[in-house]
Amino acid sequence: AVATALIQVAYMGLVGSFPFNSFLSGVLSCIGTAVLAVCLRIQVNKDNKEFKDLPPERAFADFVLCNLVLHLVIMNFLG
């Protein structure tokens, strides 16, 4: 996801950023999804002592809900 965001930034640098809101939406979608995936991996990791009481199903449900909210906000930003 981060590599896709970097490709989008490079493309914007080469071609231009005429529809700037769609560029921002694409980059924020990539970065937001990467951050949510890292949070899911931290919560599901069995070696992590901080989230021992959290079941993996709850962590995955949080990931899905936050991803849904993220993409609804991005779709709203696109107009």
Swiss-Prot record:
It is a multi-pass membrane protein. Signal peptide: none annotated. GO terms for cellular component: oligosaccharyltransferase complex. The chain crosses the membrane at residues 20-40, 59-79. One of its GO terms (biological process) is protein glycosylation. Keywords: Apoptosis, Endoplasmic reticulum, Membrane, Transmembrane, Transmembrane helix. It is found in: Endoplasmic reticulum membrane. Residues 1-19 are lumenal. InterPro entries: DAD/Ost2 (IPR003038). It holds the Pfam family DAD. Residues 41-58 are cytoplasmic. Pathway: Protein modification; protein glycosylation. Component of the oligosaccharyltransferase (OST) complex. Belongs to the DAD/OST2 family. Subunit of the oligosaccharyl transferase (OST) complex that catalyzes the initial transfer of a defined glycan (Glc(3)Man(9)GlcNAc(2) in eukaryotes) from the lipid carrier dolichol-pyrophosphate to an asparagine residue within an Asn-X-Ser/Thr consensus motif in nascent polypeptide chains, the first step in protein N-glycosylation. N-glycosylation occurs cotranslationally and the complex associates with the Sec61 complex at the channel-forming translocon complex that mediates protein translocation across the endoplasmic reticulum (ER). All subunits are required for a maximal enzyme activity. This is Dolichyl-diphosphooligosaccharide--protein glycosyltransferase subunit DAD1. The gene is DAD1.
